Each structure stands twice: as C-alpha cells, then as structure tokens.
Amino acid sequence: PIKSSAASDVYKRQDATIGKLGFGEKLLASGFQSVTTRTAGFATVSQAELTSASKLFGCILMFIGGSPGGTAGGIKTTTMAILLLTCAAVIRGRKSTECFGRRLAESNVRSGIAIVFLTFAIWLTGLFGLAVLEPDERFIDLMYEATSAIGTVGLSADLTPSLTRGSHVILMILMYVGRIGPITMALVFAGREDMQAKFRDLPEKRIMLG
C-alpha cells in the first residue's frame, strides 16, 4: 500500500537498514517492508536494526494483517475498517455503521469489535508473559516478536533464538491463536444465534461512558 510504504520510508530514513541505499532502492525496500509485514515473512533489511518507531509501525501493520479470503494473518483489513467506520458513525451521531451508501449489518459490526478486543487481549497477555520471563530484553523487541507471532508474519528482530523455553511456548501459542483464532471467532460469532433472544425484549438501560 502506498500510504504504509511512505510512512515506513519516513520512519526508516535514519535507519542503518536503508541509510546507504539510493532513493529508488529506499522506496523499493520500504514498499516491500510494508507488504511483508502483512504476513509474507520475507525480509530484505535487518529487522533487528530497525528503529523503535519503525518496529512500532511494523507492529501496527502486523496486527492488522491482510484482507480476508487468503492466508494473511492479523485481524484483517475489513475488520479494522469496520472498527474505524463505527467510530466515525458514533462521532457523526449516526445510529448505524455506513459504507459506500450501504448500512453494514449489526452482526458484522459486533463480530468485528469482538475479534479486535479478543485478539488484542490475547496478544497483550502473551506480551506480558514475555516481559515477565525476559526482563533484560528491550520491550519493543518483545512486542515485535509477539505481534509477528499472533499475526503469523514470520519476521523476527533476531531475538527469538535467545529467548527461554517459556517464551518459546508463549510465542507458539500466539502463533496457533493467530492462525485459527480470528477466523474461528468470526465464524462462531457470525453463525451462532441465541434462540431465546428471539422471544424476549429486555428493557433498555443507559450507562455513563467516558
């Protein structure tokens, strides 16, 4: 994607990874880096030498992942789009989430929010475990490894080989969850329906938010 490629180039401009490359080579390296973080796992530059800003930006791309219908990991681009569109609808005071002149199904919106929240909760739990087991490692590197695992990306900041067995177990669990978790959760939330809800209508209650 053009935007992510441009942002990646900005964050990596001072990196040792592409600092000596020509302008055209920098664009190619940045473009490939923004694409490979979606799930490809190939690296043309050293991930360990990326700056903290570049690694953080890479974590965002890895967490979002690619589009549905393929082998890409992450929460998927459509799920992230639903989340952003829902936020926009709330800000604009609209009752439903809209996109290109269509109203998105409420089941899609609820499933998308659930997928993002559950995936983030599992990722955060795994990252916390890594931080506890690896107190001497840089937190941004642990975050990069955890996000790459749950996003089934395959990139590494050259940290995984030196981790303890407990950390390896955490990363393996994140990989399994990332591979089957979001897809399975989407199918479960989309296909499961509470039969009792059809015959009851509970009173509405408003609570304070924010």
For the regions a protein language model found, what residue spans apply to each?
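Positively charged, low-complexity/disordered segments
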Residues: 1-7
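Membrane-proximal intracellular helices of multi-pass ion channels
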Residues: 8-210
